[in-house]
UniProtKB/Swiss-Prot annotation:
Keywords: Acetylation, Apoptosis, Cell cycle, Cell division, Chromatin regulator, Cytoplasm, DNA damage, DNA repair, Mitosis, Nucleus, Phosphoprotein, Repeat, Ubl conjugation pathway. One of its GO terms (biological process) is mitotic G2/M transition checkpoint. The modification N-acetylmethionine is found at M1. CDD domains: BRE. Pfam families: BRE. This is BRISC and BRCA1-A complex member 2. Induction: Down-regulated by DNA-damaging agents in fibroblasts, by retinoic acid in brain glioma U-251MG and promyelocytic HL-60 cell lines, and by bacterial lipopolysaccharides (LPS) in peripheral blood mononuclear cells (PBMC). It comes from Homo sapiens (Human). The modification Phosphoserine is found at S2. Belongs to the BABAM2 family. It is found in: Cytoplasm; Nucleus. The lineage of its organism: Eukaryota, Metazoa, Chordata, Craniata, Vertebrata. GO terms for cellular component: BRCA1-A complex; BRISC complex; cytoplasm; cytosol; nuclear ubiquitin ligase complex; nucleoplasm; nucleus. InterPro entries: BRE.
């Protein structure tokens, strides 16, 4: 159900509270998922004119789970705070004295419900952490992370239900990784969606038993960061080592991700240097180039009255990854009607060269390769 459809069914006096939740409500570490509501119902009599829904189920993303809490207002007394039912978490009993925004409920503040939900989620986190006491190993993992503020202050924990047969229970740690994405080139962060939310990397680590014999890590990147780093398949994190600890494993993943970000940033500046060198060396031979991301360059060159194009595609992780050179005849066509071309990656190249050296080496390579390309174009293409 879309937020607009849901709000149209809510009692008008309660609508500001719910609007703040579904339109602006982001609670916890997962900034890519908003709060949402379902199961709208009314406690009013059938004679009450609509819209009159005053109770609903609130879906809250937390530690890779979705909490489903029932929130019950009274449309006849909209100035009163709501009641809460915590669904499957019957053991979760919040401390009323710690719910400041519920105790001092202010119906003139449209964010009062959202503020109460945030306080409840904080208490729910403490409730889940306390459940780890049933396992000394999981408690050790939690306490060692807690001692490091960069991890302990950005962590959610969900302790699963105890297995009736084995007495074991699973637990999931969700951590917001302290990786700086602020220097990623802005062109890589475009065109994902209108409201991408916070740029964030979350590491989920699931312990399927209390002795950590089955541990499954997974990395989640917000849409813009995933796009900027080359897609979901571009980053593979290591398996959790047997006998390993989170306090050792999490920094490894942070280091891996930080290096990936640095590769992207370095690639952007190196591509810009590369294209600047080609502009200097080839001058009027430059037909066009990508002036934003510096990922493409096209040259129009001549060798003994034979004109040809060279399309240069620079990869995301340049200079580590070698550019592709595509030679294209301006005279000859393939059977499908396309200009005859050949792509080359087997040419002199070193990622240690600066842009000027790469341009000089490319110019020398063009002179040696063009004669055989011209011959192939005449042999395989049509005028």
């Amino acid at each position: 159900m879309s937020p607009e459809v849901a709000l149209n069914r809510i009692s008008p006096m309660l609508s500001p509270f719910i609007s703040s939740v579904v339109r602006n409500g982001k609670v916890g570490l997962d900034a890519t998922n908003c709060l949402r509501i379902t199961d709208l119902k009314s406690g009013c009599t059938s004679l009450t004119p609509g819209p009159n829904c005053d109770r609903f189920k609130l879906h809250i993303p937390y530690a890779g789970e979705t909490l489903k809490w029932d929130i019950i207002f009274n449309a006849q007394y909209p100035e009163l705070p709501p009641d809460f039912i915590f669904g499957e978490d019957a053991e979760f009993l919040p401390d009323p004295s710690a719910l400041q925004n519920l105790a001092s409920w202010n119906p003139s503040n449209p964010e009062c419900l959202l503020l109460v939900v945030k306080e409840l989620v904080q208490q729910y986190h403490q409730f889940q952490c306390s459940r780890l006491r049933e396992s000394s190993r999981l408690m050790f993992e939690y306490q060692t992370l807690l001692e490091e503020p960069q991890y302990g202050e950005n962590m959610e924990i969900y302790a699963g239900k105890k297995n009736n047969w084995t007495g074991e229970f699973s637990a999931r740690f969700l951590l917001k990784l302290p990786v700086d994405f602020s220097n990623i080139p802005t062109y890589l962060l475009k065109d994902v969606n209108e409201d991408p939310g916070e740029d964030v990397a979350l590491l989920s680590v699931s312990f399927e038993d209390t002795e950590a014999t089955q541990v499954y890590p997974k990395l989640y990147l917000s849409p813009r960061i995933e796009h900027a780093l080359g897609g979901s398949s571009a980053l593979h994190i290591p398996a959790f080592p047997g006998g390993g600890c989170l306090i050792d494993y999490v920094p490894q993943v942070c280091h891996l991700l930080t290096n990936k970000v640095q590769y992207v940033i370095q690639g952007y500046h190196k591509r810009r240097e590369y294209i600047a060198a080609f502009l200097s060396h080839f001058g009027t031979g430059v037909v066009e180039y990508d002036a934003e991301g510096f990922t493409k360059l096209t040259l129009l060159l001549m060798w003994k009255d034979f004109c040809f194009l060279v399309h240069i595609d620079l990869p995301l992780f340049f200079p580590r990854d070698q550019p592709t050179l595509t030679f294209q005849s301006v005279y000859h066509f393939t059977n499908s009607g396309q200009l005859y071309s050949q792509a080359q990656k087997n040419y002199p190249y070193s990622p240690r060269w600066d842009g000027n050296e790469m341009a000089k080496r490319a110019k020398a390579y063009f002179k040696t390769f063009v004669p055989q390309f011209q011959e192939a174009a005449f042999a395989n293409g049509k005028l």
